[in-house]
Amino acid sequence: MKESIHGPILSLNHGTYAIRISGRNDLKSVEQWYRMTKANNFSEFREAMKIQGVPMFNTGYADKEGNIYYVYNAKIPKRKPGYKWRSIIPGETSTNLWTEYIPYDSLPQIKNPAGGFIQNCNSTPYLSTGNMDEINSLPAWTGIETHQTGRAIRSLELYGLDSSISRDEFLKYKYDHTYSKSSLISKTRDKYIEHMKSDTSSVLRTGLDLLENWDLSADSTNRAAALAFLVLPKAFKPEDLKYNPDSVTKKLKQSIRFLEENYGTIDIPLGKVFILKRGQKELPLSGGPGLLRAVYYKKLDKKYIAVAGDCYIQFVEWGPDGKQQAWSIHQYGSATKDKSSPHYGDQANLFYQEKMKQIR
């Protein structure tokens, strides 16, 4: 592969491009991961993070001393002003060549926020505690997200508004199945239903009524969620909430036909259509895209199979005496590729029931 001062070169039929990637030639990630796992306290952990060998990933920290910490871990280039950095920039000059990075200490981060919790769901770091004034901000040219995902909104509604959270409440919130009324899927539903108020088509009316009365729950027994999942998630562009009502109507017609032809009704329980599949097991799942119980699906014949979202989950707590307890779950089991192993799918039943096993 050819190289330029900016990085590797790609020659395509519409042009020749050089790609510059943060940390491309940095081999310190292994050292950083090692030091993070060997850290005995917050100071050692933060020193490991300052290596900046790992160029990405939101990072959270907690310890037996009661400390919690969040950092928007990123190797962000110090870019020169005057260029549209969200677009393709000229490659025939070195004047736009960046060689330095934002220092670790300047990244958005916070230790022990007043609210007593941290969260980030691939959303803006500035609202990781629910209070934008608590976390230092950087200029817009850094490219840091400013949007809130549905999971982040719901996380702040649940964890952020509860001043005293028990273990059971913590897990209940993590497995929450309900979309916020402020989520994009809720806003899209409401906007589309309002747009279709004047439509009296008998073909669509039943489907529209089902969507309008949907309580935003993605419990496996919910009878409106299946239609909602088939119609709404791809109906909008997250960055601007713009959508074409005609394309939504087309998707609604297709989804009504699919459910009626395969299940005889459009108000089929979600878990009959959207499932966890492992070997011969087919298990009804609660949860969906953009929820704290995150599940993303792919169509396979007449069913939609979970392919992404929640996977390995670990829950750790320290008692007043500093004693640690931990629980975990994997959507399948510890032998992810060995179909002959008893551990190929032995955790699937616990996973779909939203239970965890204690680590001993």
Segments (PLM) and residue ranges:
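C-terminal/peripheral segments of proteins
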Residues: 1-194, 200, 204-360
